[in-house]
């Protein structure tokens, strides 16, 4: 009788162990191949974990190709990972994270006519550090944009009737920021009255320009025109 009880207990424990393994496999079916990055033996080295199953839509990169870029007088083959908010560069065919320094890292990409700066900026009530694209700049006025890519977790079908949804890197709308007289970098207001109040000496002229030119405070080209008008 005791032997029978022992056999039953061992069988049940084995079943629970196998079940937990299967549950673990199900949870890890859709794992990101890009977002989980490990640092290898070399500091800053990037290694990408491979996916076991499932599809992946989109990309964490604004441009997946490594493009010639200039940083502090040196030239690198680089690309920008907007999901991780990091630049990567090639070093003897190895992908390495570029170390960014606040206020000191400027990445210029002549081929794309783009310049990134690593800055401290205000986002609502919090402050963030990251790369912003410079759209317009004078000594007293600057316009930036933040490029964003979010990771959306996929859905694994539990039965043959369920629909599978792949993991996805989704490019979000760019967010625009301004800086006046070297002050805080903050979001561009999307309402005309709030925006014109930033420029008390020019508020009427700016308001007229926005209305007469049908300027959208959410559109990159419109904002560049507007800031060029203000900066004259």
Kindly give the residue locations of the regions a language model identified.
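Long, compositionally biased interface segments
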Residues: 187, 196-232
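Sec-dependent signal peptide cleavage junction
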Residues: 19-53
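Acidic/His-leaning functional-site neighborhoods
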Residues: 190
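Aromatic-patch recognition
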Residues: 60-187
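Bacterial Sec-dependent N-terminal signal peptides
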Residues: 1-25, 226
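A short, Trp-centered hydrophobic/proline-enriched beta-strand micro-motif
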Residues: 42-71
């Amino acid at each position: 009788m005791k032997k029978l009880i022992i056999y039953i207990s061992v069988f049940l424990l084995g079943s629970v162990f196998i079940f937990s393994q299967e549950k673990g496999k199900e949870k890890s079916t859709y794992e990101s191949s890009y977002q989980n990055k490990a640092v290898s033996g070399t500091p800053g080295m990037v290694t990408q974990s491979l996916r076991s199953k499932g599809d992946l839509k989109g990309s964490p990169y604004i441009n997946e190709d490594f493009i010639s870029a200039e940083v502090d007088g040196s030239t690198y083959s680089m690309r920008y990972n907007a999901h991780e908010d990091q630049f990567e560069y090639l070093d003897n065919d190895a992908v390495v994270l570029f170390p960014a320094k606040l206020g000191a890292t400027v990445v210029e990409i002549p081929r794309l006519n783009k310049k990134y700066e690593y800055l401290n900026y205000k986002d609502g009530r919090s402050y963030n550090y990251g790369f912003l694209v410079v759209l317009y700049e004078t000594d007293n006025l600057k316009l930036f944009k933040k490029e964003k890519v979010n990771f959306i977790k996929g859905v694994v079908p539990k039965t043959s009737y369920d629909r599978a949804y792949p993991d996805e890197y989704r490019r979000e709308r760019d967010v625009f920021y301004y800086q006046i007289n070297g002050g805080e970098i903050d979001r561009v207001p999307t309402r005309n009255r709030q925006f014109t109040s930033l420029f008390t000496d020019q508020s009427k002229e700016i308001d007229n320009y926005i209305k007469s030119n049908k300027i959208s405070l959410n559109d990159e080209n419109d904002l560049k025109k507007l800031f060029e008008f203000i900066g004259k």
